[in-house]
Regions:
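Core segments of cupin and vicinal oxygen chelate
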Residues: 2, 11-52
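Short, conserved charged micro-motifs
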Residues: 19-21, 82-87
């Protein structure tokens, strides 16, 4: 194995599955392709790439995400162009989702925001990506 493996899927633990399904449906303008429940595990799944949110019946009450703890810092969704990245602030505004400004760094440009469980999300355009629409 000489190359870094591709990511297969992302799964985030949320406090309220139904509330999160509704939030991500509005964000992506797409319903999940599957909602499942098995024992204490409940999940909703979107494909391309595979993205899931899940809630366990035995969660810590009142817990919220904090990227300063060991574990996940944030999840970034890729943008194919600068035009696509620049379209997201208006979309987030229309949804009433607070966000920062697009930040240009040496490794790429990103727009950070948070879901209702305080999980930091980002739309990201790596350096070397298309700058055209």
């Amino acid at each position: 194995m000489s190359s870094f493996p591709a990511f297969n899927h992302y799964a985030l633990t949320v406090s309220d599955l139904q509330r999160s399904i509704e939030w991500y449906e509005r964000l992506f303008e797409s319903p999940p392709v599957a909602v499942m429940e098995e024992d204490s595990f409940r999940a909703a799944i979107w494909f391309e790439p595979m993205f899931a949110i899940h809630a366990n019946r035995h969660q810590v009450e009142g817990d919220v995400f904090d990227e300063s703890r060991i574990g996940l810092d944030h999840v970034a969704f890729g943008c194919a162009s600068r035009t696509e990245l620049e379209s997201w602030p208006a979309r987030l505004d229309a949804l009433g989702i607070e966000h920062g400004e697009i930040l240009d760094r040496s490794y790429g440009a990103g727009l950070a925001f948070r879901d209702q469980d305080n999980i930091q999300l980002e739309f990201f355009l790596p350096v070397g990506s298309s700058s055209e629409g």
